[in-house]
Amino acid sequence: LSSQVRQVIVSLGSHAVIPLVTALPKVSAEQQELVVNLVADVPYATSIPFLSDLAATSAVQPVKDACQRAIERLGGAPAGADVAGLYQSLAESYYQERKELTSFAGEDFQLLWSFDPGTGLLMSAIRTPVYHEAMAMRLATRSLELRPDNPDALALWVSSNFSREIDTPAGYENPTYAKGRRDAMYYAVASGAGVGQRVLGRAISTNDTPLARRAIAAIEQTAGGSSLWADMAGQRPLLSALTYPNRRVQFDAALALAAAQPNTAFDGSERVVPILAGAIHESANMVAAVVAPDNETYQAVRGMLERMKFSVLAYGKTLDELAPAIAESPSIDLVVAANLAGDATPAFIDQVRGTPRVSAAPIMVLTRADVYQSLRRRYETDQTVSVRQSALAEATVAKAVQQLIDDASGGALSTDEASSYAKRSLAALRDLAVSGNSVLNVSESTTALIAALGERKGAMRLDIAEILARIGQDRSQIALMDAAMASSGAERVALMHKVTASARRFGSMLQPRHVDQIAELVAKGPDAEANAAAALLGALGMKDNRVVPLILEHAKK
């Protein structure tokens, strides 16, 4: 190369590294030595894994020597370094979307490079939201080629593939992922439960809610028994998910653990049934916490959020002031920082991320115009933080809030979704009740089930009654009987059958008033209700026989 050409390439800095190292494996040994010496003049460690790879695989000594000189010049690893580990480390940096690995920050597209011996270097544009995932998958793939038995590299590849799927813009065809290729879940499930747990651990540590949900879905399909709560390098990701500050993740984790029907207690087993019970009467209501310097600002934000169907916690100037209200809420779906002093906002966001109950909550920052640009640049790659000027129209801010929640946590819990979780949780609790599971004891859900019995209607109400009929507590049987008497027609008959089932299992726990009501129905109720009441009366096994007077009375007619 002429000195001028060399100077131009070196002046490109980090932009030159990936194109050059992409060509390395596919050019002649003479060209390899030339490229290696050129890369050595570009002071970026990004090239070290590729140089180490070539040093380990080349059979040409001058090439190997040139690689080692370049590595030493760049401050890299000595000869014989773990090349697979170097690729994995660089893949991790791409997965984290480090700024120094983003060629065109703030742009819609990045460049991907490939090399064809016939035509040379080829570049293709790729949307920025999926660029880092593409590079992470490419590098993790090479790491796995060198060391196939590395579960951490495989978990990184699976995580990157899930993130690619999550971040792909609607309607976009990714040039690195063929349209007919299997979806990310296929590879996650095929990789096994251990890899799934590693992916979940990554999601929890980075507060990546969409990734956490996909990881749990994969684990549920592959893991069983103690593998669900096994220790993974000092972590138990699925158990940690039970306290993750997102309702969907908690529900998903509890459902997965309940399906396993554990026969020995584990750390966190006491949380499973209460979470499932909470899902039964969980509404689609979203909860927001607003921190503002004054009540006027708070009221303005609160009004907007309430019009978006949020429930908003009481006013607080700081997160600490809101701590009691946050602790009592089932979850916090949004945190709003409204007009905080510019230098206070980053500290506030750090505090939120360090507070377990809200660590994964999306954060909407509403700020003054003079600090807007600096804050937006600071958080532009964080999908859990959105920065907007507080002077914007309400409709614009509301749209930004909705987009933030969609991106960070999968959107608001819809009415249909809440109903689906309730039905799945009921099915899980019923299975636990039928099996008599002593580790996940459904009796711990009694209070919530009794409350839900009064709230729900139709088939779901009868499903709740079925579980209560399998709980040997007087309050369960009494609640069922009270519900039956408050109903009529077919529903009353169905609920009385549940009371009968409870009495057959556990004996009578009813109060005298209930027995009188039953006897009244036997004597005077419509045929269907009278027959159901008669069966219940028999199941109660009362010492004072209520049947003889009925026989004598009916004999007179």
Predicted ranges, named:
Residues 82-84, 89-139, 163-197, 229-238, ...:
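Short coil/linker segments at helix-helix boundaries
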Residues 152-153:
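TPR alpha-solenoid repeat register
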Residues 332-360, 366-375:
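Conserved phosphotransfer microenvironments
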Residues 317, 366-406:
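Output/docking surface of receiver
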Residues 284-297, 301-306, 335:
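Conserved acidic segment of CheY-like receiver
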Residues 315-334, 342:
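Acidic, metal-coordinating helix/loop segments flanking the phosphotransfer/catalytic sites
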Residues 2-14, 19-25, 31-44, 53, ...:
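Structural detector for internal amphipathic alpha-helices that build alpha-solenoid repeat scaffolds
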Residues 1, 8, 19-27, 50-58, ...:
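Alpha-solenoid HEAT/Armadillo-like helical repeat scaffolds in large eukaryotic proteins
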